[in-house]
């Protein structure tokens, strides 16, 4: 397979007289920074000659210390989170318990003798990466492409961008980590087909399906597990060592487990003075975890429509374990691509995309997807989905909405995220109101609502009312972060509750239709002097009573049947002229349009 030439040439000039942009992989465990020139990639090392810089930050002697494996760890997991979420999630609380300011109304950490927000602390890591690169390249760096997990939501993405901005970077693009890894393989160069990216990092698992046609990278589905990664493998091995050799469940035993795992990626056994474990035992221990990742990958393929895939791209240090390659091949019977260092694939892709974005003539395009559906709450609590799950982005969708009651001078918009049919079951992202509308009859006002997601996955919503020329726009920045686990739960709940949700929606829609019909007909009876026959009015009221009883019974089939009965008997029993009026009302016309 032809791939982009990715090497670290001794003679390459990475500080030419041209624009320079770097790629940054801000990881949970380690971070990397790289630069590409003429499609050749160089990972920039730290001052102590490390390419993988631990994503840790400490504050001692009035200075920030980055990468010494002390202090605050895994800050990436805090992006987009609220104080409430931290307090209610033991795994997150354990990360920050020594720094958390529980008296604050928002998430702040007591760090560097100050109360700092997560982006302010993360910015120090970006500054460290920036300084290391500037020192080696002997030039100022201001532009970067930064990778994020495929399931990062708007809040998390926004905080990553803010941290980078504080550090002095202009973020050219946020790209999903699996997409960056695929880009690193040079699949945009005379390659066509569908590829599965299997990304098993230290703390998370991501899988994406990408379609590549004529230099266009399109993500068509994503899936993952935020609580599954190489760290879980370490825990399983640690538990085995504790039970088998009567060792304490301590940091030292965990480090021993990690060493055993790494050794068994290239040897058949691991032995030291205290323990011994062989490859066969390791594989028995971790097989259930590996099978979970395979199942998630297969679910992702189903979401994508079960396309024929041409290869599996491995990303993340944990994929060095031979069992993972073996099980992937058994499951998919296709090429397993691992010829790029899995720890570097993401940052290489980011660096190549950075060069591509600043080059005079770009020759490739990355298209990501929305991880969850986005929509609005309608009357009755129904969700109108506007951008669907796994829709390619960037995208802009326009829909028209109207008022439900007379003399509304404002329309409230409730933006939602999720797969369920009712607003109460989805995640609230934002609310805003379009004010100053002219008081008019229901149905006259027309508001155009535009949902737009940019290439970085940031959502903006605007509304425009034509008659009053009133508009309002917001960039949706949710107050709550949403990680992959929550997304998976949302999708799973949507699947499990699909039938219930569908029935609930049908009922609510039937109730809304019935209430609108009752309102319109009763108003017509009161306002139109053409109705002189008491017998006609009696027939109509009797039919309306049937509809009201059906609504009270909360039976959508009964409601629909009573509405059908109303329409049928009206045609047969009512005066022709009034029949025409009723039919116009049933078609949604306003009473004033047909007086």
Swiss-Prot record:
Protein name in UniProt: Chaperone protein HscA homolog
Short name of one Pfam family: HSP70
Entry-linked SUPFAM superfamilies: Actin-like ATPase domain (SSF53067), Heat shock protein 70kD (HSP70), C-terminal subdomain (SSF100934), Heat shock protein 70kD (HSP70), peptide-binding domain (SSF100920)
| Source species | Rickettsia conorii (strain ATCC VR-613 / Malish 7)
* Gene designation: hscA
Q: Which UniProt keywords apply?
A: ATP-binding, Chaperone, Nucleotide-binding
- Output one GO MF annotation: unfolded protein binding
Function, in words: Chaperone involved in the maturation of iron-sulfur cluster-containing proteins. Has a low intrinsic ATPase activity which is markedly stimulated by HscB.
What biological processes does GO assign it?
A: iron-sulfur cluster assembly
Family per UniProt? Answer: Belongs to the heat shock protein 70 family.
The protein's matches in HAMAP family, at most eight in alphabetical order, are given as:
HscA
InterPro entries for this protein: ATPase_NBD, Heat_shock_70_CS, HSP70_C_sf, HSP70_peptide-bd_sf, Hsp_70_fam, ISC_FeS_clus_asmbl_HscA
């Amino acid at each position: 397979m032809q791939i982009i030439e990715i090497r670290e040439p001794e003679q390459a000039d990475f500080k030419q007289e041209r624009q320079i942009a770097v790629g940054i992989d801000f990881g949970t465990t380690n971070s990397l920074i790289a630069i590409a020139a003429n499609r050749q990639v160089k990972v920039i090392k730290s001052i102590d000659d490390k390419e993988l810089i631990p994503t840790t930050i400490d504050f001692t002697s009035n200075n920030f210390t980055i990468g010494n494996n002390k202090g605050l760890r895994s800050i990436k997991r805090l992006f987009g989170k609220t104080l409430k979420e931290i307090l209610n999630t033991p795994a997150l609380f354990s990360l920050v318990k020594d720094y958390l300011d529980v008296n604050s109304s928002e998430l702040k950490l007591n760090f560097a003798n100050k109360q700092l927000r997560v982006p302010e602390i993360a910015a120090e890591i970006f500054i460290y990466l920036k300084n290391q690169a500037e020192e080696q390249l002997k030039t100022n760096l201001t532009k970067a492409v930064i990778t994020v997990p495929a399931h990062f939501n708007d809040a998390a993405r926004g905080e990553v961008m803010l941290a980078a901005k504080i550090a002095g970077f202009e973020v050219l693009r946020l790209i999903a980590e699996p997409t960056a890894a695929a880009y690193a393989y040079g699949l945009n160069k005379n390659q066509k087909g569908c590829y599965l990216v299997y990304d098993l990092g230290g703390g998370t698992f991501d899988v994406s399906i990408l379609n590549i046609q004529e230099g266009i990278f399109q993500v068509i589905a994503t899936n993952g597990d935020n609580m599954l990664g190489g760290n879980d493998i370490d825990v399983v091995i640690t538990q085995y060592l504790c039970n088998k050799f009567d060792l304490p469940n301590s940091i030292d035993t965990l480090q021993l487990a990690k060493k055993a795992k790494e050794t068994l990626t290239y040897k058949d056994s691991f032995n030291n003075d205290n323990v011994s474990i062989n490859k066969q035992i390791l594989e028995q221990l971790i097989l259930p975890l590996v099978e979970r990742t395979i199942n998630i990958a297969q679910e992702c393929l189903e979401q994508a429509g079960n396309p024929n895939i041409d290869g599996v791209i491995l990303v993340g240090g944990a994929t060095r374990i031979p069992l993972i390659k073996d099980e992937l091949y058994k499951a998919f019977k296709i090429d397993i691509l691992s010829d790029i260092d899995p720890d570097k694939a993401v940052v290489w892709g980011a660096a190549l995309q950075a060069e591509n974005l600043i080059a005079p003539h770009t020759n490739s395009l990355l298209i990501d997807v929305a991880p969850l559906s986005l929509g609005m709450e309608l009357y009755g609590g129904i969700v109108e989905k506007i951008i669907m799950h796994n829709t390619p982005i960037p995208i802009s969708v326009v829909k028209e909405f109207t008022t439900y009651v007379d003399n509304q001078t404002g329309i409230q918009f409730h933006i939602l995220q999720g797969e369920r049919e009712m607003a109460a079951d989805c995640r609230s992202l934002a609310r805003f109101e379009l004010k100053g509308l002219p008081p008019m009859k229901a149905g006259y006002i027309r508001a155009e609502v535009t949902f737009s997601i940019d290439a970085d996955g940031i959502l903006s919503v605007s509304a425009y009312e034509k008659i009053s020329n009133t508009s309002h726009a917001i960039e949706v920045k949710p107050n709550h972060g949403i990680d992959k686990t929550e997304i998976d739960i949302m999708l799973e709940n949507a699947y499990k509750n699909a039938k219930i949700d569908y029935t609930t929606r049908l009922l609510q829609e039937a109730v809304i239709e019935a209430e609108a019909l009752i309102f319109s007909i009763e108003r017509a009876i009161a306002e139109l002097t053409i109705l002189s026959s008491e017998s006609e009015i009696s027939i109509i009221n009797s039919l309306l009573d049937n509809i009201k009883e059906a609504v009270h019974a909360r039976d959508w089939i009964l409601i629909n049947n009573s509405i059908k009965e109303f329409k049928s008997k009206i045609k047969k029993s009512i005066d022709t002229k009034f029949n025409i009026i009723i039919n116009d009302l049933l078609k949604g016309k306003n009473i004033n349009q047909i007086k």
